[in-house]
């Protein structure tokens, strides 16, 4: 049952308590396990602040399976709360990533946050906190340009404030779901005498999804001080790969009109039983970056996780992109020539993560060629684990 002493208002309690539940989705409209969290009393629907899901589908700008999953989850939560779906926009961030190739199992990660009177006894150190933000409307002509960078940076700053975090080093993951171009969006821009960054709506090297994702990533980098704002210009987006964020995981879809931001950080003022850490893989074959994320979250291990340590891992969030080069550790690879190369990147990332954690319900996004998410060839990974008593 929900904690009767927990409050959703910080006015009556001091400490935020964030939690996560990961449940399966057997189809884009399958919300049975999600609804069961409410029916069993495991989750108070009023405490939900974010839904982060992986759906089956193409993962492209017009992935209707992703949209179907998004609508299904919103509808289920609204019914549990007894409110119109439209009322969720101001209180819940919904980010659904399409495409679950390889070992990735479709699922939803339910993020909750309540307010409690006391910090947990026996759990030393810092715990997870959650912050949310929304951008101003991102117009079609903004996508992939500095206008989007600035709007996302402002929303990330708001999310930090919402989380009660002042030090960017405490931030380990910033997820942004933004808009991508569509034929309708392009027509709208042209009708107003504006231009757009590309005529490709997809996820290829010139695809609008890549432009949007990378502008959002640079917005994260600017907000966190990873990149100075005066270094970012339109002609450096998707060009200067030395500009990047180590904690951004961004995605986009043609159905969006603005950006939703979810920030996960650690704080000594957190009552959460969870903690987050992050790492960066050095290439498509590297597992050390994943292990670093788990270790920095608080799990101490040598080469492999024990079964008990695997159970301590609540969720892994990974952004796996395609490298700009067709050479991996001195050898030629053909991933860049694959007609569904974006699925290859996700499948490889999923295999790496699941081989370590043993959990197919991991959030693996990606598929872009080159990215401002992580350094050239690298991929940002974040891990949320359960804190153990001292």
UniProtKB/Swiss-Prot annotation:
Summary of subunit composition and partner proteins: Homotetramer; disulfide-linked. The disulfide forms between 2 monomers in the tetramer, such that each tetramer contains 2 sets of vicinal disulfides.
Residues where substrate binds: 66, 97-98, 213, 251-252, 346, 365-366
EC number: 3.5.2.-
Top-level taxon of origin: Bacteria
Protein name as it appears in the record: Cyclic amide hydrolase
Region (RU B): 127-268
Record note on domains: The monomer structure is formed from three repeating units (RUs) that share the same structure as one another. The monomer and the active site possess nearly threefold rotational symmetry, to the extent that the active site possesses three potential Ser-Lys catalytic dyads, but one of the 3 active site surfaces varies in composition suggesting it is involved in conferring substrate specificity.
Species this protein is from: Pseudofrankia inefficax (strain DSM 45817 / CECT 9037 / DDB 130130 / EuI1c) (Frankia inefficax)
Role this protein plays: Cyclic amide hydrolase of unknown substrate specificity. Catalyzes the hydrolytic ring-opening of a cyclic amide. Does not act on cyanuric acid nor barbituric acid.
């Amino acid at each position: 049952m929900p904690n009767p002493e927990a409050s959703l208002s910080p006015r009556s309690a001091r400490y935020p308590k964030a939690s996560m539940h990961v449940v399966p989705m057997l189809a884009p409209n399958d919300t049975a396990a999600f609804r069961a969290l409410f029916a069993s009393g495991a989750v108070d629907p009023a405490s939900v602040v974010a839904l982060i899901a992986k759906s089956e589908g193409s993962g492209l700008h017009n992935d209707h399976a992703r949209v179907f999953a998004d609508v299904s989850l919103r509808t289920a939560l609204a019914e549990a709360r007894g409110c119109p779906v439209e009322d969720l926009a101001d209180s819940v961030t919904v980010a659904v990533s399409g495409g679950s190739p390889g070992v990735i199992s479709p699922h939803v990660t339910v993020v909750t946050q309540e307010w409690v009177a006391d910090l947990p006894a026996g759990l030393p150190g810092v715990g997870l906190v959650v912050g949310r933000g929304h951008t101003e409307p991102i117009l079609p002509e903004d996508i992939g340009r500095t206008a989007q960078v600035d709007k996302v940076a402002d929303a990330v700053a708001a999310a930090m404030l919402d989380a009660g975090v002042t030090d960017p080093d405490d931030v380990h993951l910033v997820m942004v779901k933004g808009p991508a171009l569509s034929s309708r969006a392009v027509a709208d821009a042209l009708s107003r005498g504006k231009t757009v960054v590309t005529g490709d709506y997809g996820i290829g090297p010139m695809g609008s999804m890549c432009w949007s994702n990378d502008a959002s990533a640079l917005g994260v980098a600017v907000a966190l001080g990873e990149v100075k704002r005066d270094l970012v210009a339109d002609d450096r987006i998707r060009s200067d790969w030395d500009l990047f964020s180590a904690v951004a995981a961004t995605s986009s879809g043609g159905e969006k009109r603005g950006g939703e931001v979810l920030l996960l950080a650690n704080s000594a003022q957190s009552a959460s039983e969870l903690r987050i850490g992050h790492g960066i893989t050095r290439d498509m074959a590297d597992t050390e970056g994943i292990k670093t994320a788990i270790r920095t979250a608080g799990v101490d291990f040598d080469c492999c996780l024990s079964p008990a340590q695997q159970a301590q891992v609540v969720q892994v969030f990974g952004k796996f992109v395609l490298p700009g080069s067709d050479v991996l550790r001195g050898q030629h690879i053909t991933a860049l020539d694959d007609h569904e190369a974006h699925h290859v990147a996700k499948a490889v990332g999923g295999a790496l993560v699941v081989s370590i954690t043993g959990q197919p319900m991991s959030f693996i996004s990606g598929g872009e060629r080159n990215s401002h998410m992580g350094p050239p060839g690298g991929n940002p990974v974040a891990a949320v684990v359960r804190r153990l008593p001292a």
